[in-house]
């Protein structure tokens, strides 16, 4: 009986190489999966360039879980080295370089957020690797060898570089290293498959070329769609405000998701859930509510999903996130550590300071690491959500 690969094909944009009938000598990914005598090594890399992961980032993670459930080994690469360069893909200017401490903090919060998605428990199903393990050891000779595998013309054909070159915006030489370093990750972990968004095809193809260069069998590329944000127009992005963060309060998640435009619902169900598409409710409003409930359940459990639904149906503001009035603060400027004690999120200002230093405090999803963070005026805080740990939230209101 032919193996069912519906889990593989759901919600993907492209698998490459994909042999045609005239290329019967080229192996397909389905054939490799069906005939392999060992678990395939399936790579997904993520650079910890910020504190948050949103639902758009979860799409390749969910596909990675699909490979795990099929018996293969997910190799999650934390790009602690490449994050300090920054992926130039789709960027019109050079990215700010991060400090080692920035990257370390972000990496830990990424792992915390993906635990509900990936199988961390079954032996042999997950490797978490940091690419500084091998990239930090490259000497000038090896770097020269990597650079010699590509031409400047090939690099300038990459969309982001091509646009910047045309507009005479600067392109720095270290940025040319990024695709080569991502590609070398595939060599270092001997990847059989690499997952990425549709914007990563160039980088994944570089990995295939480098594997050939180093005598390895080239990996397959599995490209996944870029998720459109809750505005229904542009790709999901924190900077555009059209995102749903994995670390958000269940009520906030529910509120945002029940407002997803009708035209996007099928894509959201296909990419973010395992529900059968042909069994969805006909009424768009019912589909929105089911989507919101299902995704909150995935990350917070059924009870939290039911509570968020009930709060939304009863008109609960932002899913009943508790509120604290800033009028209770006797004077400004005010330190964040004091505010944590005043809101009851921490027992005291001292505990608030310790929580900040430990990396356990967020404001609107952004990790705060400076214990002396101070706010000059109430309007800097109005409407924002303070978070301590995973489950304590407080909305700041006038």
From Swiss-Prot:
Pfam families membership: SYY_C-terminal, tRNA-synt_1b
Q: Which UniProt keywords apply?
A: Aminoacyl-tRNA synthetase, ATP-binding, Cytoplasm, Ligase, Nucleotide-binding, Protein biosynthesis, RNA-binding
Provide the S4 RNA-binding domain boundaries: 334-398
Q: Name one GO biological process term.
A: tyrosyl-tRNA aminoacylation
Its Gene Ontology cellular component terms are:
cytosol
Which residues take part in binding ATP?
238
Catalytic activity reported: tRNA(Tyr) + L-tyrosine + ATP = L-tyrosyl-tRNA(Tyr) + AMP + diphosphate + H(+)
Q: Where is this motif: 'KMSKS' region?
A: 235-239
Subcellular compartments: Cytoplasm
Name the domain of life. Bacteria
**What Gene3D superfamilies does its record include?**
HUPs, RNA-binding S4 domain, Tyrosyl-Transfer RNA Synthetase
Q: Which CDD domains match?
A: TyrRS_core (cd00805)
Q: Which GO terms describe its molecular function?
A: ATP binding; RNA binding; tyrosine-tRNA ligase activity
Show where the record puts the motif 'HIGH' region.
Answer: 48-57
Q: Which SUPFAM superfamilies match?
A: Alpha-L RNA-binding motif, Nucleotidylyl transferase
Q: List the disulfide bonds.
A: none
EC number(s) of the enzyme?
A: 6.1.1.1
What is the purpose of this protein?
Catalyzes the attachment of tyrosine to tRNA(Tyr) in a two-step reaction: tyrosine is first activated by ATP to form Tyr-AMP and then transferred to the acceptor end of tRNA(Tyr).
- Cite the PANTHER family for this sequence: TYROSINE--TRNA LIGASE (PTHR11766:SF1), TYROSYL-TRNA SYNTHETASE (PTHR11766)
| Family the UniProt entry places it in | Belongs to the class-I aminoacyl-tRNA synthetase family. TyrS type 2 subfamily.
How does it associate, per the subunit comment?
A: Homodimer.
* The name this protein goes by in its record: Tyrosine--tRNA ligase
Lineage, highest ranks first:
Bacteria, Bacillati, Cyanobacteriota, Cyanophyceae, Nostocales
